[in-house]
Amino acid sequence: MGDNNRATLGSDAAANAPDAAAFDKGKGKATEDPSLEMSMDEDEESEENDDEDGGDNLEPISADNIISGGRRTRGKTIDFQEAAEKIQGDDDDEDDDEEFQPNDDDDNMRD
């Protein structure tokens, strides 16, 4: 009776019916095709070479494109309250939409 507690380890898939269905499914050891791996590596190397060649054609930076003057805010104190008040003054134009009176001529059909 001690044989009932012993596990049977068999590699025969037909002997274990539930294992037979699961043998082909799930995460298994993937087979790798070395020819595909080699070609992918070669493609990556050729792309890297293309990037290196494109960097040699850079033009020098023109001094005309460099901004100088009062546009820099680094090191300056900004009064956000004053800026908010200035923006509120600009929003007054949106209130004009409420005062709009359409013409009654639009009700007539035209030919």
Curated annotation (Swiss-Prot):
Signal peptide: none annotated. Residues 39-56, 90-111 have a biased composition (Acidic residues). Pfam families: CHZ. Residues 22-32, 76-89 have a biased composition (Basic and acidic residues). It comes from the Eukaryota. SMART domains: CHZ (SM01082). GO terms for cellular component: nucleus. It is found in: Nucleus. Residues 1-111 are annotated as: Disordered. Keywords: Chaperone, Nucleus. Its main location: nucleus. Residues 12-21 have a biased composition (Low complexity). Belongs to the CHZ1 family. Forms a heterotrimer with H2A.Z-H2B, stabilizing the association of the histone dimer. Also, with a lower affinity, forms a heterotrimer with H2A-H2B. Forms a chaperone-bound H2A.Z-H2B complex that acts as a source for SWR1 complex-dependent H2A to H2A.Z histone replacement in chromatin. This is Histone H2A.Z-specific chaperone chz1.
